[in-house]
Amino acid sequence: MKKTAICTMGTRGDVQPYIFLSKELIKNGYEVTLGSHPCWRALVEDAGIHFEPIGPDIDIEKEAAAIRGAVSNPALSMLKTMNFVFRIIQESTTEVYEACKGKDLIIVSHSQMGAVEAGVLGIPTVNVTLQTEMIGEKLRPQTFKDKVIGGMIAKQVAKPYNKIRKVYGQKPVKSADEIMSDRLNLIPISRYVVERNPYWEEKNVLTGYWYDEETEYVPDEKLAEFIASGDKPVILALGAMSFEDRSEKEKLDMFVNAFKKTGSRAIIQGFQKTMRDYVLPETMMACGSVPHSWLFRQGKFVIHHCGFGTSAATLVYGIPSVPVPHVLDQLGFAMQLNNVNVATKPLKAKDLSEETIIAKIKEMHDSYDEMKKNAEMISERIKTEGGVGEAVRLINELIT
């Protein structure tokens, strides 16, 4: 039996793709260890995967909310969040090293977590990349200017990993590319959503999205009754962006009032602190953790933050989107949805108001039939790719 380890940091959306991959690997005879923040133990173990706690015992989504709440600029917010996560990765290297020991393969997550440790241990690696913008165009002819600017950026990106390399007496690298697998980089995105860049090296493979149907889920009686009692509701699912550092009644009011004024029924996920003493009208209800594979099929469209996982779920389950990106990478995923005409143009978080939300709901209604048709068509195509199965097939080819 082949033994593999995956270590990842971040919110649930950063962990979920690796749960899907781990489950498929286990089905194919692998022994898998998935390491992450201690707060994700139940999520991972409930999926039948061996869990290893990595890093401090913190609520990562609340920590991310505190950082986000202090900065309004999406690029700066993303940079501060990345610095926070990189600091945890550096401080957790001993735990990552222990999780990697004795394994036949290390699957290096999108934060490059485990890459240095695998190199020290002499264990082969496979990479996973969620943002295609992070993949170098190695086959593109480079001008002198390209080389100079690229070298400067690469040096900055490599800094956190060189700090880890120093712990093990390793020489610094000039680029994070030097610690990536030279054989396989898995990109869990559909070729029907993003075209393969002709300047990528052959090792970079668009597998299709990784997902799980979660067919065993049964909603509670209250949620089932609400779904059955009227028109399909709007789903408000801001993911980790609705985890509040403090009560955000003003933001929730914007959405609730916009739903009232547009005559929209709605299901609202998140806003736990605000919801404790918040009274919703009968046309709306709050729900906790419900699988997107079930919830999104019940909705008319989704208003969401465009994290990787939620964006993928809207495409997999064939539902249009109103994107509300909060940080820079989310803006990129929002543009992917808009480019294939399954979403309105993004409504940036800094521009949120009752009026702008109403305008986006009206924009969605005006083009809904076309967007819904496109979403369902792409969903059918995605299902022909068998993304997570393709990923495991490629891994098998590599190590057998």
Language model features: what each stretch is:
Residues L105-S109, C287-Q336:
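A donor-sugar binding/catalytic signature common to diverse glycosyltransferases
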Residues E195-F301:
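Donor-nucleotide binding loops and adjacent catalytic segments primarily
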Residues M1-E52:
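N-terminal subdomain of nucleotide-sugar transferases
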Residues T33-M78:
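Conserved nucleotide-sugar phosphate-binding/catalytic loop shared by glycosyltransferases and other
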Residues T344, A349-K350, E354-E355, K360-I378, ...:
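Conserved donor-nucleotide binding/catalytic region of nucleotide-linked donor-dependent transferases
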Residues S36-R41, S109-G114, S190-V193, Q269-R276:
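Short, polar loop motifs at secondary-structure junctions
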Residues Q156-E202:
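A short, active-site helix/loop in glycosyltransferases that binds the activated sugar's phosphate group
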Residues F86-K155, Y192:
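Conserved nucleotide-sugar donor-interacting segment of glycosyltransferase catalytic cores
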